Regions:
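Phosphodiester-processing cores and adjacent nucleic acid-binding clamps
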Residues: 1-139
Length: 139
């Protein structure tokens, strides 16, 4: 059965992870994983290194980022499902740095995600408003 972790942070999530891309891809290859995703916190800095390492190992790379939402104390994970999604993802994350900085933290407005949703998959946690609604039986 195929399985992919969507919440992996790499060494590019400086305060959050020490996972090195080379070791990550090597472990995934040894485990015969067909795909591998990264979702560093509020950035896409690892994209090129990760993408090349995955292709060299014969693994499908999935690019994402875990981002903070405005007026919310939780995060969502945004994944690019195709090239258009990758362009939209880079735009959303960049906009957080340019227009959404709050005390040095890039914050994403939900409208930015809706406006650039094509090709972007949004994963909510159980702590988000969407997750809480589902847990309480009100999807």
């Amino acid at each position: 059965m195929a399985f992919v972790h969507f919440g992996i942070h790499t060494e590019f999530s400086i305060t959050d992870s020490i996972v090195c891309i080379k070791a990550l891809v090597k472990a995934a290859k040894a485990d015969n994983q067909l795909a591998l995703a990264i979702s560093d916190l509020s950035n896409l800095y690892a994209t090129v290194k990760f993408y090349k390492a995955c292709l060299d190992a014969g693994i499908k790379p999935i690019i994402g980022s875990e981002v903070w939402l405005e007026n919310d104390s939780t995060t969502v994970t945004l994944l690019a499902s195709n090239q258009i999604g990758y362009k939209n993802l880079t735009n959303i994350v960049s906009k957080g740095f340019v227009d959404g900085q709050v005390m040095g933290k890039p914050i994403i407005q939900r409208d930015w995600i809706f406006e650039r949703s094509e090709g972007v998959i949004v994963l909510f946690t159980e702590k988000s408003d969407v997750g809480q609604a589902m847990l309480s039986g009100h999807p």
